[in-house]
Amino acid sequence: MGQPGNGSAFLLAPNGSHAPDHDVTQERDEVWVVGMGIVMSLIVLAIVFGNVLVITAIAKFERLQTVTNYFITSLACADLVMGLAVVPFGAAHILMKMWTFGNFWCEFWTSIDVLCVTASIETLCVIAVDRYFAITSPFKYQSLLTKNKARVIILMVWIVSGLTSFLPIQMHWYRATHQEAINCYANETCCDFFTNQAYAIASSIVSFYVPLVIMVFVYSRVFQEAKRQLQKIDKSEGRFHVQNLSQVEQDGRTGHGLRRSSKFCLKEHKALKTLGIIMGTFTLCWLPFFIVNIVHVIQDNLIRKEVYILLNWIGYVNSGFNPLIYCRSPDFRIAFQELLCLRRSSLKAYGNGYSSNGNTGEQSGYHVEQEKENKLLCEDLPGTEDFVGHQGTVPSDNIDSQGRNCSTNDSLL
């Protein structure tokens, strides 16, 4: 987001030096510009490369094309726009110590900045709600949230984010009335984001705090339910093991089925942890900035401009973290390796459902259709335990020893 202040002091700039030798001061300034330029360029490259990789992987590999990963694609798009249209201009603003792109682009750039942050937090909020319904109502989930509905939700998220970001800024509802702000608005080389108190508080609440509270509340409920289900699984599997030990010893396939079905449930809980890490990282990166954003308009001189800019850039860096977090998922790791040509042949990945849309055929269609469905966790199915007891085998890979549905979306493990 735009920086507050008068535009004369920038993050980590050596302007405070009063060295007697002008040449030494100028040399230090050049070293600082080069060093910060390299660091900021690496940040931009990491954001763009990582999120292009995520978007391409989900678009190319059918196994990754789940409802949840549609939302992940939306999140990656927000991060990609941040890396292409926001961070580079923010870096230029800092390195050049002035704004050289004109007043129109200043407001447009600020609007895109707010848009990306708002779209990201709202998408994370939607993902939390998605996981809540998936874990609490796995049988109703697929009819409740189809891929077409997911596309509509994503479109609505971006429309709402666009309205809350572009409308107030382009209509100048954000503008402060004190003289320093008025001078900046009239100056083509000034792009400090002076805002009135009402806008700063309202935009922070609508764009960040409300979605954050919803996300934290819903995801805490998801983890409570996941913990309850894990405890239930542990207890029921213990009873089943004691009651059917001799039978399992007689039929090795049963033991294999039990182990495999248990892995489905554990994988889904690992997926929840990964999503929790994504949400937690986003919160840790952006919460300090939004706290300072409100404090700054209430007490102007309390927060140094350098601190404000530093916290803003910590938020920017978050856009490069998510692709690294996705590497926790074996599915994403395999997809990334395929895209980066780090695997010998995609044919070896058919067993994991990894065939690109262009190469998908009869060989892998059945497995892909089975695996890409987005049922979650475990729900009791009456009568299946009796079936297992009489037949000696688990009726399906997606049904565990106690008859619980353990289909999993393991693309985010």
Swiss-Prot record:
Q: What is the effect of changing residue 341 to A?
A: Loss of basal palmitoylation
Query: According to its UniProt entry, what is the function of this protein?
Result: Beta-adrenergic receptors mediate the catecholamine-induced activation of adenylate cyclase through the action of G proteins. The beta-2-adrenergic receptor binds epinephrine with an approximately 30-fold greater affinity than it does norepinephrine.
What results from changing residue 265 to A?
A: Loss of ligand-induced palmitoylation
Modified positions (4-hydroxyproline) in chain numbering:
382, 395
Q: Which family does it belong to?
A: Belongs to the G-protein coupled receptor 1 family. Adrenergic receptor subfamily. ADRB2 sub-subfamily.
Q: Where in the cell is it found?
A: Cell membrane; Early endosome; Golgi apparatus
Q: Quaternary arrangement and interactors, per the entry? A: Binds NHERF1 and GPRASP1. Interacts with ARRB1 and ARRB2. Interacts with SRC. Interacts with USP20 and USP33. Interacts with VHL; the interaction, which is increased on hydroxylation of ADRB2, ubiquitinates ADRB2 leading to its degradation. Interacts with EGLN3; the interaction hydroxylates ADRB2 facilitating VHL-E3 ligase-mediated ubiquitination. Interacts (via PDZ-binding motif) with SNX27 (via PDZ domain); the interaction is required when endocytosed to prevent degradation in lysosomes and promote recycling to the plasma membrane. Interacts with CNIH4. Interacts with ARRDC3.
Q: Membrane side Extracellular: which residues? A: 1-34, 96-106, 175-196, 299-305
Protein name, UniProt field: Beta-2 adrenergic receptor
Query: How does the protein associate with the membrane?
Result: Multi-pass membrane protein
Cystine residue pairs: 106-191, 184-190
Please provide, in alphabetical order, the Gene Ontology terms of the cellular component aspect for this entry.
Answer: apical plasma membrane; ciliary basal body; cilium; clathrin-coated endocytic vesicle membrane; early endosome; endosome; endosome membrane; Golgi apparatus
Q: What is the effect of changing residue 341 to G?
A: Uncoupled receptor
Q: Name the residue ranges with Polar residues bias.
A: 393-413
Asked if the record carries the keyword Ribonucleoprotein, the reply is no
Under SMART domains, the record lists: 7TM_GPCR_Srsx
